[in-house]
Amino acid sequence: MLRQTAFRSMKLNRTPGRYFTTAENMDTGSSQSPPDTEQKMQPMDEFTKEFLKNQIKLTELQRVILSAGSSIAALVDPRRHDMIACLGETTGVPALENIRDQMRNSDEGRQILEDKPRINTRTVNMDALKKLPENTFGYQYVSFMEKYEITPDSRMEVKFMDDPELAYVMTRYRETHDLVHTVFGMPTNMLGEVAIKWVEAINIGLPMCYGGAIFGAFRLRPKQRQNYLQRYLPWALRAGQRARPLMCVYWEKRWEQDIEELRKELNIEVLKVD
């Protein structure tokens, strides 16, 4: 079974979803292990190794203090994405456990948890996606990223969690955020961000998504707020509820898929924006 344990060589496979780095052979660090050890020991995947190397362990008191501090900072300045990310790690464990269970109960979700794919410029061949037909999800994703001058490398690493698998679920949420924007056809302006936060809140269930949606709306200008209440909010609540569970979608296997077919498959409703 191929695991994404190392991303050493960029390889473009002409099958749907394989526009990312794969490891042909796993390097376990030794040529052979004793038979009993080999059966008992499972190789640690690359994500877990990297996470444990950078993990910052907290006591319960430290976690409470960090949660309170990041909450206040995020309320004072919703642009503090670092504080919002920190808040998500220190308060979102029950929701992440629910998401993980949902993924385990889905064939596609289980495969994601097993492979632990990453989305960044080291693992996704953006140039290859750019050469796909314009109607494909992969082409639309690259076009979205270029239009709004976004890089997939900008997502913060998860550091303050105890469980590596839950840390991956949080990482997966962060790294697929722009894919959600793409498939819902929603821009990255303030109105679009608040709307997508509502979609994610309803569909995924992370507390930080609810917080971002509620408090982000206070930053809207009066004219934007009217448009938000009349069009964007009703759409976001409806779209988040109707869509298939977004965390169970193996997006990387959909690069070559027609984006309208993908939307139909995932039951995604697109709002016509000005």
UniProtKB/Swiss-Prot annotation:
Please give the pathway this protein is involved in: Cofactor biosynthesis; ubiquinone biosynthesis
Q: Which residues bind Zn(2+)?
A: 177-178, 181, 193
How is the protein disposed in the membrane? Peripheral membrane protein
The listed locations are: Mitochondrion inner membrane
Q: Subunit structure of this entry?
A: Component of a multi-subunit COQ enzyme complex.
Q: What does this protein's UniProt record list under function?
A: Lyase that catalyzes the C1-decarboxylation of 4-hydroxy-3-methoxy-5-(all-trans-polyprenyl)benzoic acid into 2-methoxy-6-(all-trans-polyprenyl)phenol during ubiquinone biosynthesis.
The protein in question is named: Ubiquinone biosynthesis protein COQ4 homolog, mitochondrial
Q: Which organism is it from?
A: Aedes aegypti (Yellowfever mosquito)
UniProt lineage: Eukaryota, Metazoa, Ecdysozoa, Arthropoda, Hexapoda
